[in-house]
Amino acid sequence: MTITAAMVKELRELTGAGVMACKKALVETDGDQEAAIEILRKKGEATAVKKSGRIAAEGVVFTAVKDGKAAIVEVNSETDFVAKNEKFQTFVSNVANQILDSDAADMDAFMAEPWALDTTKTVKDELVSQIAVIGENMNIRRFKKIESDGVLASYIHAGGKLVY
């Protein structure tokens, strides 16, 4: 089967993977998009394992407040360049919003929860996917959730940049 640019573009939009990685996956699967997605997912897991030994000391703190609940989360990356990246920021925002609806008592329980935006994945699976797309080691370092009948508000100094 001939792999067209449109097929590569569609797979790239679905996965966020690079052009050549998408093309290779489509060639390997003879144009089967679902099989190509699975190959890219497995490749992303391998990439995440390789990157997991690298230090992720940069990152951001993000808060979410809704219906008497507030969550704060710290997500780390290797560089401040990635910490400022729109995809990274969106991921961190989604993590904070998921924490609002989570009953997880600790990080292990949270990482095992279904990802709210795609329940076929866990939070850990989505983190691995983001590592593959962004290309740096990342980790959800810590989070805290509070509930109150009073007023909850949020303020993050310095745009959420980590300062030690």
Segments from the language model and where they lie:
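N-terminal assembly/interaction segments in proteins that build large macromolecular machines
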Residues: T2-Y164
